[in-house]
């Protein structure tokens, strides 16, 4: 039996769908309050849904009954300052519990981390799996939670766990809707006026799912892989989206000081309204930083060729 945690989320649902399309009958976890993803509705007969929470060990024990493979896609994600410590605690403790249970039962795991947990490369070089985030200087709650969760998997591997780790860049796809990375497309459609100088990696959600499944089917263990379809300057990305949506592309450069003003304003508004800020300190500053990711390790490991980012952008725009 194959288990997918976090299957109601953007990536988890795609992993579940890909597994079903390959002829598998799978088990997926969901919290009691979570809704079934629309993309999985046609495959209800092939999916055994169970109520489970990574913070509830007993529910995980039941979910893991008869399981031989786990795709761990579950994570608590929030930009709210008040959620920073709970997010770190939840993601790390939940991962640690799952790691221990899988290790005890001889279950193979593919763990979803993030490039947020990967460090910086020297100027002019691409970021690889050999770079590591410095926990003594990092302040972003999400990055810390991903780094410390990944460290729990490395602990498990040292204790005998059969596992690999994937570090996706920004995952995009039509099924995101207007949530998560879908906000980028929604913002451009509604009339984005400014762009930043930064560069970041993007990858199709289907490619991430396919890479995870391909890795699961190998005998590779104790490795991490950056999953990146291509690097894009934000200006280029916004222009591609705008052209696809037949709207005006942003033409004004948002300088770093302007981004500082933006995140502070968003934080103040979020404090007044109790809502998540549209942009936080970390993402505001990252928007002006050049981060290019090297995907050669995963391509070599499984012989994978990524879908062009431009093709995914077109698909998302056509579905909007």
Residue map of PLM features:
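N-terminal Rossmann NAD(P)H-binding glycine-rich loop of SDR-like oxidoreductase domains
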Residues: 2-22
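NAD(P)H-binding glycine-rich loop region in Rossmannoid oxidoreductase-like domains
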Residues: 47-93, 101
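Conserved catalytic-site region of short-chain dehydrogenase/reductase
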Residues: 79, 115-125, 171-177
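Conserved Rossmann-fold NAD(P)-dependent oxidoreductase catalytic core, especially the SDR/UDP-sugar
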Residues: 93-141
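Active-site Tyr-X1-5-Lys
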Residues: 139-164
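Substrate-positioning beta->alpha
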Residues: 148, 179-180, 196-216, 223
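NAD(P)-dependent short-chain dehydrogenase/reductase
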Residues: 160-165, 169-202
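Mid/C-terminal beta-alpha module of Rossmann-like enzyme folds, strongest
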Residues: 211-279, 295, 300, 309-318
């Amino acid at each position: 039996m194959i288990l997918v945690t976090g299957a109601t989320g953007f990536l988890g649902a795609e992993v579940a769908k890909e597994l079903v399309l390959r002829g598998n009958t799978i088990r997926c976890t969901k919290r009691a309050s979570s809704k079934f993803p629309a993309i999985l509705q046609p495959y209800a007969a092939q999916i055994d849904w169970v109520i489970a929470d990574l913070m509830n060990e007993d529910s995980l024990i039941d979910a893991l009954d008869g399981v031989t493979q786990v795709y761990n896609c579950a994570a608590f994600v929030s930009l709210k300052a008040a959620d920073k410590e709970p997010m770190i605690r939840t993601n790390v403790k939940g991962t640690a519990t799952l790691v221990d249970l899988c290790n005890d039962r001889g279950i193979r795991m593919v763990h979803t981390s993030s490039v947020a947990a990967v460090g910086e490369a020297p100027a002019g070089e691409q970021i690889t799996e050999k770079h590591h985030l410095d926990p003594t200087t990092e302040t972003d709650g999400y990055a810390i939670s991903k780094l410390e969760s990944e460290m729990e998997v490395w602990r498990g591997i040292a204790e005998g766990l059969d596992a690999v780790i994937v570090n996706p860049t920004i995952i995009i796809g039509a099924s995101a809707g207007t949530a998560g990375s879908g906000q980028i497309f929604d913002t451009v459609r509604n009339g984005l006026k400014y762009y930043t100088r930064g560069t970041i990696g993007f990858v199709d959600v289907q490619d991430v799912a396919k890479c995870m499944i391909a890795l699961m089917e190998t005998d590779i263990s104790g490795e991490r892989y950056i999953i990146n379809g291509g690097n894009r300057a934000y200006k280029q990305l916004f222009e591609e989206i705008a052209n696809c949506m037949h709207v005006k592309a942003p033409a004004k450069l948002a300088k770093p000081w302007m981004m500082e003003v933006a995140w502070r304003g968003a934080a103040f508004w979020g404090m007044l309204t109790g809502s998540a800020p549209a942009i936080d300190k970390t993402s505001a500053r990252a928007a002006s930083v050049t981060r290019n990711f090297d995907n050669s390790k995963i391509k070599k490991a499984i012989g994978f060729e990524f879908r062009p980012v431009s093709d995914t952008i077109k698909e998302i725009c056509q579905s909007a």
